[in-house]
A protein has these predicted regions:
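Active-site neighborhood of glycoside hydrolase catalytic domains
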Residues: 73-177
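Aromatic-lined substrate-binding rim segments of carbohydrate-active enzymes
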Residues: 1-33, 121-148
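Aromatic- and acidic-residue-enriched segments that line the glycan-binding/catalytic groove
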Residues: 1, 36-62, 98-122, 167
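Active-site-adjacent "subsite" loops/lids of carbohydrate-active enzymes
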Residues: 4-19, 29-88
Length: 177
């Protein structure tokens, strides 16, 4: 297929999956990757893609384009997309992956210092500010889903342990990022 174009003949894979799951007594949880706007392997983006419409709202990080989590308009945009999914489809749950900032990549810094300076809300540490943005997003996502269909489950795929002994005395005995 081509991004931004409906398949011909038209069919809706999410609707089809919901029907097939429900016929079999199974739940269907839609799974999205909210901040990742373009992966390394993506070559062409539709003209109406958020990256083309609002290039200042994304940053390049290690070859990927990421919707900047520090911008309130990006949190709202993602919540609007989720609201559309929840309203239009009979999903049983919505699951998000990579709901946080990009994983560390050697030699790359997350280019959000300008947004931190502008929107820090008095938070003195950029990493605390990033966690604050994630918390704002989680709350907005939960409220968005529950306002439309309170019974729809909301799930998150967190990444391991947030701290380990190699970077914090109070961390876990793990060796993850």
């Amino acid at each position: 297929g081509v991004q931004g174009k409906a398949p011909n003949p038209y069919w809706d894979p999410l609707q089809w999956m919901i029907e097939q799951c429900h016929k079999r007594g199974m739940e269907l949880h839609a799974w999205i990757n909210p901040y990742r706007a373009k992966t390394k392997g993506t070559s062409a983006l539709a003209k109406n893609h958020v990256v083309n419409l609002h290039p200042s709202r994304v940053f390049d990080y290690d070859g990927q384009l990421i919707l900047n989590p520090g911008l309130a308009e990006n949190r709202k945009y993602i919540c609007d997309v989720v609201a559309d999914i929840v309203a239009r489809y009979d999903i049983d749950g919505l699951h998000i992956d990579d709901y946080f900032y990009p994983y560390p990549s050697p030699g790359h810094e997350i280019p959000d210092a300008q947004q931190y300076k502008q929107y820090s809300n008095g938070i003195n540490d950029i990493n605390d500010w990033r966690r604050y943005n994630v918390n704002l997003y989680m709350q907005a996502m939960q409220e968005t889903i529950k306002a439309i269909k309170p019974w729809v489950k909301f799930g998150v795929s967190p990444f391991g342990s947030c701290r380990n002994k190699k970077n914090s005395q109070i961390g876990s005995e793990t060796n993850g990022l």
